[in-house]
Curated annotation (Swiss-Prot):
PANTHER family: THYMIDYLATE KINASE, UMP-CMP KINASE 2, MITOCHONDRIAL. This is Thymidylate kinase. The lineage of its organism: Bacteria, Pseudomonadati, Chlamydiota, Chlamydiia, Chlamydiales. One of its GO terms (molecular function) is dTMP kinase activity. It comes from Chlamydia caviae (strain ATCC VR-813 / DSM 19441 / 03DC25 / GPIC) (Chlamydophila caviae). Keywords: ATP-binding, Kinase, Nucleotide biosynthesis, Nucleotide-binding, Transferase.
Length: 207
């Protein structure tokens, strides 16, 4: 099973990814947790290049194709082998983040970026079985980030940008209600975890 955790900056998705991994392992499941950008040596280099605030400005198109290249490598080297071996794969961000950030917020076009993402994802096996969206008001998410650490390139963008991100994720969730689980990012993560586990159990019974 392939589970993706999505959300705005500061929503808690990375923490939820770890909690979900730990809960599933405690139940005796074989789990691989990964992230995007990242998940492979190439992906981690792309992550460092794009997110590092000191990196000279690059165009949204360049960012897009770097993300897609990293995803192709990630799928080939990590996600596909893990799924083929019977692991549950949990990914902190996947192609919906690209659609929202580059397609919607950066203005490259939702349909255009979606088409490119689908070419990279390829066979249906690489589409998530479940996408969990931690939804949180953009201003609250940014406040959390500002309290935690120095901001990366995307976290440092203005509130209007992050509002577009939130609206973009919600529009995708509305368009794909059968594969999306919307979670309130303001509630305790343990509550979100329990809801994800319920959704996971229901899906597992259908497989």
């Amino acid at each position: 099973m392939f589970i993706v955790i999505e959300g705005c900056e500061g929503s808690g998705k990375s923490s939820l990814t770890e909690l979900l991994k730990d809960r599933l392992i405690a139940e005796g499941k074989a789990v691989v947790a990964t992230r995007e950008p990242g998940g492979s040596p190439l992906g981690e280099r792309v992550r460092d290049l794009i997110l590092e605030p000191s990196t000279p400005s690059i165009s949204p198109y360049t960012e897009l194709f770097l993300f897609l290249a990293a995803r192709a490598e990630h799928i080939t080297k990590k996600i596909f082998p893990a799924l083929e071996s019977g692991n549950i794969v949990i990914c902190d961000r996947f192609h919906d983040s690209t659609i929202v950030y580059q397609g919607i917020a950066e203005g490259l076009g939702k349909e255009y970026v979606t088409s490119l993402c689908h070419h990279v994802v390829g066979e249906k096996k690489f589409l998530p079985d479940l996408t969990c969206l931690l939804d949180i008001p953009a201003d609250e998410g940014l406040r959390r980030k500002q309290q935690q650490k120095s901001l990366d390139k995307f976290e440092d963008k203005p509130l209007a940008y992050h509002t577009k991100i939130r609206e973009g994720f919600l529009s995708l969730a509305e368009a794909h209600p059968n594969s999306y689980l919307i979670l309130d990012g303001r509630q305790p993560l343990e509550e979100s975890l329990n809801k994800v586990m319920t959704a996971y159990t229901e899906l597992a019974l259908c497989k």
